Amino acid sequence: MAMTKFIVRLLLLLGCATCSAAAEPLRVMSFNVRNSDARDGENAWPKRTEFFFTTIAAFVPDLIGFQEVLAVQHDALTARMTDYAFSGVARDDGHRKGEWSCIGYRKARFTKVAEGNFWLSETPDLIGSKSWDAALTRICSWVRLRETDTGKEFLYANTHFDHRGVIARQEASRVISTRLPQIAANLPALLTGDLNINEDNPAYAVLVKPTIPGAIRWVDSFREVHPIRGQDEASFNGFKGTTKGSRIDFIFHSAAFVATESAIDRTTRERRYPSDHYPVTAVLQWK
């Protein structure tokens, strides 16, 4: 009898430990870094690098999607963020030419299962491809991760839509809505990025109210936590501290998660900003 009670207690303890691990939330950030080639004077990359990294460290993300990363910045990320592994390639040549939409994930928590990239074009597998009215080549990078403690797997994708192409942005949403379900294969999924659109744009509707068969119905974490749309939701600041306006930077999740926190991080230091975009953050709980 004593042995039976011991086994029951042990099983209960193990079950509680598993539940505790499974309930650990995901801290997610999306951050457009502002590319280092831009002639930004006092806001140039070398003058804000330290502030940029301290801003990230303050949130302690488990997962982070970057946009506009050039080679010198990618080298800085990998050198400075040693607790993270990175996935993604530069968009122009699939190696180091052009901007990355790379992903960082905490090495102590996640193991990479698979990774890849596709281009937001009519030929998604063609490196450096560009279509429609897009001004620039655009890419979506993804990584399939396994949570070490629980064995849970999920897909995380990160992207940056074109800043000029109206048709290209809507078609980019369609490419993502077609490709990511194939890659996810019914796994839970996350999508972050600078989409260069607001919630009124048809490209946004393609993601959150999909009509494409099999598409993931993406949930906007910020709107989930803050259901009433406000006037001070700008996520682009132009190094001027702008707050009025709409978000163009997003953290989406599939139905496997629920957002318990979501914010636009408007950290400043002596009227300086870590980038011309505010980082956006979310805390996601497994359902």
Model regions and ranges:
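Structured beta-strand-rich core segments of catalytic domains in phosphoester-bond hydrolases
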Residues: 63-157
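Active-site neighborhood of phospho(di)ester-bond hydrolases with catalytic His/Asp-centered motifs
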Residues: 65-67, 88-89, 190-194, 220-223
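Metal-dependent phosphoester-hydrolase catalytic domains
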Residues: 109, 144, 167, 171, ...
